[in-house]
């Protein structure tokens, strides 16, 4: 198993290109099931989750070619509607095939999903919504079995709480349903917006894109004509590299970004004292004279993203005073706290609120990644620490960050990927 060895204390310099967004790419790949012909998707990040979903589609009878961030996928005629445990267990996003397969073929079986161990992330909201659209759903031997032999019917779906993958699943299901589906309390994330825009470009009538109420006119099981897709840049990767610049007190630029997707992150960096230059597709961060403590509450987009919480906790270790971080979306997303303490961090936990007491002198340590974003926080702490840090179980990192150590080394970091 691989681990990363980081020699800390290096100043970073230069610019880093931001990859396509994994969380946008996954629903876009799933949406090719709705297409009547092959679909090209470019700017795909070279990360494990993308390869896993492509392999899942191949298992279902799709064909694809994938090289240098460009995939050509033909999922127009699947030969199976069963997404098996051996692939689904490694990735939660596998559930995204449920909506499109059920809508198109009238039946789908998906093994209950795996992925990061950060809280329950129940798929009940997906299943209840599909039942409202006429599906019969049972759980058998660890599989969700969904049946709608006469197709799905448009309905009014009110999500009890905002769900990104739930919104995406129902948008795809509604695209091929009969009649009008209204989704109330829909997620507004840029990744959801891109999926809706791609489907609209393919002829599906969708109103309210970018709002919390989506109205979708279904095609009554008529496959759609999808065009080439360019995946939006990864706002979480972008935020992580901005934190890498901040935590090493460096001047660093990120390229190929959509700055307004990062508004909530940029506000917090400015509050902490980091000067920012923002233009159309680039952001440059400069060193802070003093790093100020910050208060962060995670929430759905356009609020502060839960996927940036761990990275800001690492950064807050260097702030002059106490920072307060409240996690409102997941109940088990502070697993990185015990690992950050191995660097010397002073963090007090009470329920879903972490108080980070700074400034802390960080020392290199052996640490273990617990989930995707927590692992990037450990890398950030390692960059700032004195001495050598070894980050173990980095398969979490490889699920979501493309060439992380290569990109950081190009900026002046000293990181090696080694085998245990």
From Swiss-Prot:
Pathway membership: Cell wall biogenesis; peptidoglycan biosynthesis
An example Gene Ontology CC term for this record: cytoplasm
Cell division found in the keyword field: yes
EC category name: transferase
This protein's UniProt keywords: Cell cycle, Cell division, Cell shape, Cell wall biogenesis/degradation, Cytoplasm, Peptidoglycan synthesis, Pyruvate, Transferase
Transmembrane annotation, as ranges: none
Stored InterPro entries: Enolpyruvate_Tfrase_dom, Enolpyruvate_Tfrase_sf, MurA_subfamily, RNA3'P_cycl/enolpyr_Trfase_a/b, UDP_GlcNAc_COvinyl_MurA
Function: Cell wall formation. Adds enolpyruvyl to UDP-N-acetylglucosamine.
NCBIfam families (alphabetical): murA, PRK09369.1
Protein name: UDP-N-acetylglucosamine 1-carboxyvinyltransferase
